[in-house]
């Protein structure tokens, strides 16, 4: 049986850590930043773990 292909869109958006957590970027940080407050853009900075409800679905897309 052939290997399962990973979803290329999901592989660009999510990263799996060594412990198995799935990390994602926050939304609303790409453009029109001049209209957003500095406080908001700082809050949207960095990567955050995915919710447990979505973990299984994303790992299946990543063929893990």
From Swiss-Prot:
Compositional bias annotation for Basic residues: 1-15
Family matches, as PROSITE patterns: RIBOSOMAL_L35
Superkingdom of origin: Bacteria
Residue segments, region Disordered: 1-22
Disulfide bonds: none
GO (cellular component) term, any one: cytosolic large ribosomal subunit
Coiled coil, from the record: none
InterPro entries to which the protein is assigned, alphabetical: Ribosomal_bL35, Ribosomal_bL35-like, Ribosomal_bL35_CS, Ribosomal_bL35_sf
SUPFAM superfamilies: L35p-like
Keywords of this entry: Ribonucleoprotein, Ribosomal protein
Gene3D superfamilies in alphabetical order: 4.10.410.60
Record GO terms (molecular function): structural constituent of ribosome
The UniProt record lists the keyword Ribosomal protein: yes
A Gene Ontology biological process term: translation
Entry similarity comment: Belongs to the bacterial ribosomal protein bL35 family.
HAMAP family in the cross-refs: Ribosomal_bL35
Full protein name: Large ribosomal subunit protein bL35
Naturally occurring in which organism (per UniProt): Frankia casuarinae (strain DSM 45818 / CECT 9043 / HFP020203 / CcI3)
Lineage: Bacteria, Bacillati, Actinomycetota, Actinomycetes, Frankiales
Gene: rpmI
């Amino acid at each position: 049986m052939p290997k399962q292909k990973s979803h290329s869109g999901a592989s660009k958006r999510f990263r799996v850590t060594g412990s198995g957590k799935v990390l994602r970027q926050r939304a609303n940080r790409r453009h029109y930043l001049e209209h957003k407050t500095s406080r908001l853009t700082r809050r949207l900075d960095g990567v955050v773990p995915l919710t447990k409800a979505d973990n299984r679905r994303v790992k299946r897309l990543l063929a893990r």
